[in-house]
Amino acid sequence: MMTTLRRRLPDIVQYSVLSLAAFLSIFPFIWMVIGTTNTTSQIIRGKVTFGTALFDNIASFFAQVDVPLVFWNSVKIALVGTALTLLVSSLAGYGFEMFRSKLRERVYTVILLTLMVPFAALMIPLFMLMGQAGLLNTHIAIMLPMIASAFIIFYFRQASKAFPTELRDAAKVDGLKEWQIFFYIYVPVMRSTYAAAFVIVFMLNWNNYLWPLIVLQSNDTKTITLVVSSLASAYSPEYGTVMIGTILATLPTLLVFFAMQRQFVQGMLGSVK
């Protein structure tokens, strides 16, 4: 029996640590769900059991927020921005891997170096550019800085190394143009890579807070993230209402991740199917 226990001890320790880590990760979400059913005073007192104020908190949130509008703003920015980022960045990654040029590696290195520049250093120049272009207080101004993402370009170039070059060569022999090879062959073959990139970029766009806070000024252009933040920073915040908004803001990213979890893992592992 002692021998069996010694053999299983590493597994017991491993699963205990993983269980603790999982609990610590999910506890804030559980506490947030419980908080939606309690009043502000109960939450401040630290109540960790379910209450009876759920419908009051929901009614309060919908009374203060134009939920369809802010959700539409968030969905539009997230989906359109993600689609544009995947298109531009995958084209760039494909080009850097497939085409030979003396300047290729130099340009690629410059793009990667931009990853070392903090976004805070770019905010003022970007804000001035958007102002000169007349794009302040528009959703286009939120999407543009993300379209050519250095990380996603790097990700697609690395994934493109696993793309079978025989397919490209055979397509060229059959007379296909480069854009046809990209859209009709490369994209379907690399769908797991696209799925993983979609999850990453969608979450970044959906949770984007600082840049929209600076650019979006009118209430009819704001996203769910900004609205929930404004409720939380009010002079006398209603925490139950804030938690309702936080859950509503969190659900889309969770749904996207769980719906595409298998493809996400395949894409991150470099799977090409």
From Swiss-Prot:
Give the CC-aspect GO terms. plasma membrane
Quote the CDD domains the UniProt record gives: TM_PBP2
Question: Can you supply a Gene Ontology BP term from the record?
Answer: transmembrane transport
Look up and give the membrane topology term.
Multi-pass membrane protein
Query: What is the organism of origin for this protein?
Result: Rhizobium radiobacter (Agrobacterium tumefaciens)
Coarse class of the protein's main subcellular location: membrane
Q: Which Pfam families match?
A: BPD_transp_1
Expression induction per the record is: By lactose and various galactosides, and subject to catabolite repression by glucose, galactose and succinate. In strain AR50 the expression of the lac operon is constitutive.
The protein's job, in short, is: Part of the binding-protein-dependent transport system for lactose. Probably responsible for the translocation of the substrate across the membrane.
Q: What is this protein called?
A: Lactose transport system permease protein LacG
Q: Where are the transmembrane segments?
A: 15-35, 77-97, 110-130, 134-154, 182-204, 240-260
The ABC transmembrane type-1 domain extends over 71-260
Q: Which InterPro entries match?
A: MetI-like, MetI-like_sf
- Membership in a protein family: Belongs to the binding-protein-dependent transport system permease family. MalFG subfamily.
List the subcellular locations.
Cell inner membrane
Keywords on record: Cell inner membrane, Cell membrane, Membrane, Sugar transport, Transmembrane, Transmembrane helix, Transport
SUPFAM superfamilies, per the entry: MetI-like
